[in-house]
From Swiss-Prot:
Domain of life of the native organism: Bacteria
Binding site for Zn(2+): 178, 180, 191
PROSITE patterns: MPN, UPF0758
Keyword Signal: no
UniProt cross-references to InterPro entries, sorted A to Z: MPN, RadC_JAB, RuvA_2-like, UPF0758, UPF0758_CS, UPF0758_N
Family stated for the protein in its record: Belongs to the UPF0758 family.
Protein's recorded name: UPF0758 protein RoseRS_0767
Keywords: Hydrolase, Metal-binding, Metalloprotease, Protease, Zinc
An MF annotation (GO) of this entry: metallopeptidase activity
JAMM motif, short sequence motif: residues: 178-191
Ranges where the MPN domain occurs: 107-229
Length: 233
């Protein structure tokens, strides 16, 4: 049987993504509808909503689209460079909005709060990065600083670099975060050693090290919760 595909312009007004956004707000739209608005048009035999749904399934949702390379997306049927550029720009706007939101959004109350702040970007990095979240006396984010790029070895990481920005900002505390490109967030023995060194340096500088998070693929480990590096050696 020949499949029958309805173009978006042939849908009832109440089913068109842009009209639904106007009448009900963006939060009411499904992921495929939001993506369809960016794509604008579909391809032969597939409207923009269906194309959007296919992309979301193929790449594993928004995180997968964020991780996908520009060329990988642009070569997909129905995409091309213009649509890929629009999509990548929209995803980057969302990432920057998350990182630059108001104080209330970025009040860190738990390891989960800190992980949610960092996971979107750091879970898809292809190199290890060590970052420090600088916090004020109310645990509000002051700045997120990239300290080091490369494998986390005690001989390579300069502990003093971690505290340069917290000292400048007069931070009360920091949360250290690094990623495992393998996707497995299990802390290594080197991670534990580095954590102890960072905590000791923080004590000397009167800057509390609240936690060290290891980010993996959709998962994270709080080394404080595991008692790794935060207890007695």
């Amino acid at each position: 049987m020949t499949e029958y595909h309805v173009r978006i312009r042939e849908l009832p007004p109440t089913d068109k993504p842009r009209e639904r956004l106007r009448s009900s707000g963006a939060a009411a739209l499904a992921d495929a509808e939001l993506l369809a608005i960016l794509l604008r048009v579909g391809i032969e035999g597939m409207n923009a909503i269906q194309l959007a749904q296919q992309l979301l399934v193929e790449f594993g949702g928004w995180n997968g689209l964020q991780r996908a390379g520009f060329e990988e997306l642009a070569q997909r049927r129905g995409m091309g460079e213009a649509k890929t550029a629009q999509l990548k720009a929209a995803l980057e706007i969302g990432r920057r909005l998350l990182l630059a939101g108001g104080d209330e959004r970025f009040l860190i109350r738990s390891p989960t709060d800190a992980a949610q702040l960092m996971q979107i970007e750091m879970s898809h990095l292809d190199q290890e990065q060590l970052r420090a979240i600088c916090l004020d006396t109310k645990n509000r984010v002051q700045k997120i600083q990239t300290v080091y790029i490369g494998s986390l070895h005690t001989s390579m990481v300069r502990i003093g670099e971690i505290f340069k920005e917290p000292i400048r900002l007069n931070s009360a505390s920091i949360i250290v975060v690094h990623n495992h490109p393998s996707g497995d967030p299990t802390p290594s023995p080197e991670d534990v050693v580095v954590t102890r060194q960072i905590i000791e340096a923080g004590r000397l500088l009167d800057i509390d090290v609240l936690d060290h998070l290891v980010i993996g693929a959709g998962r994270f480990v709080s080394m404080r919760e595991r008692g790794l590096g935060f207890g007695k050696p």
